[in-house]
Amino acid sequence: IMNNWVKKQADFCIVGKKGVRDNLQIAVALLGYRQEKAGEEIIECLKHQFADGHAVLTWYPYDDTRYSDQPFWIVWAVCELIKETGDFSILEQKVSWQDGGEATVLEHVKAAVRRLIEDKGENGLVKIRFADWNDALNVTDDPEAETVMLSHQFCLALRELRRLMERIGEEDYAEFLGQEYETLKAAINEKAWDGEWYARALSRKGNIGAKDSPGSKIYLNAQTWAVLADVAEGTRLSAVLAAVDSMEQDFGFPLNMPPYPAYDPHVGRMSGMLPGLFENGGVYCHATGFKILMDCKCGRGTKALETLKKIMPDSGKNPSSRSGAEPYVFTNCYSTNSGYYGKSYQSWPTGTSAWSMMGLYEG
């Protein structure tokens, strides 16, 4: 599966998806074996970024809803492209903006950084706007709400871009990025730490993913990206790893626990889903892929491999005869709801293929 079918699945995603966030993740996975195609896809995604730094969710069909995370994926993907190819000249390539004109790849990256800095809220974290990576977490009753997951991701982007800028001699900008990293990291640890794990979002109307939050108490992505970005250190790192381990299920790790029992307008669409399905407490295999990289970073190779096996097609504890998915294709989600336990939802077009590859080949 990992030497053949997962690559076919990634190729399918590149053809079938036309979204900045989605295609950049697939493109980075392609860097391991189709560098030219990966580079072309990353440049194509940059063409759908606006000069103010934000980017469309999808260009076909066209959707410019303000998902706050698009700029992060741009910075991350360009850094990964150059790390894999060693071709620094990419930074000088001219690429058009979605709203007209053109600029170098480096200017596109800097615009993405500016967008995320300008989008910071009162706690110093990045505002969630309509949603972040989790399309269904819509804190629409508080336009000032801040996303902890994306703030972790922005820390990672600042760290990686600083290293790149040092390599090309942009020392002043590298120093600026380093200062931004430390400032954001400190804000996250001051405002989002909840004693045993990180909250998922901060809001004047009540934090989401905290121990005193109604409905659901802990979110996976707010922990995994804290580790990947080096935000969680020392005793907090140990606590985060323990919190993640406590979420383990037979066939992966749920996006949040426990599921929301009823619709909560403060949380948005995910809380209206049947408990245990999709984003509402389902095992979101794409996000479990983030967890695999977290394990690898921490030297937890055995746990990384065990986790990968849990979400593999036709896995031992959730065979295709129960999940309903093809025995050779990764799926996006498995249900933890007792009435649909282990059932698969949406195989083929999912970032699970990309993150599973990255976990196995790069972790």
Question: Where are the regions that the model predicts?
Answer:
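Aromatic-rich carbohydrate-recognition surfaces in CAZymes
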Residues: 20-23, 29-126, 147-151, 155, ...
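Catalytic cores of carbohydrate-active enzymes
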Residues: 56, 153-268, 309, 313-344
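C-terminal ends of transmembrane alpha-helices
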Residues: 121-130, 191-193
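Low-complexity, Ser/Thr/Pro/Gly-enriched N-terminal "stalk/linker" regions
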Residues: 1-18, 40, 44, 115, ...
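Acidic/His metal-coordination segments adjacent to aromatic residues that form catalytic metal sites
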Residues: 52-65, 129-146, 203-212, 267-277, ...
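Short helix-capping and inter-helix turn/linker motifs at the boundaries of alpha-helical repeat units
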Residues: 16-18, 215-218, 281-283
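Conserved hydrophobic/aromatic pocket- or pore-lining residues that grip, position, or stack substrates
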Residues: 5-9, 26, 45, 181, ...
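Conserved helix-loop functional segments at active or binding sites
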Residues: 11-12, 47, 51, 80, ...
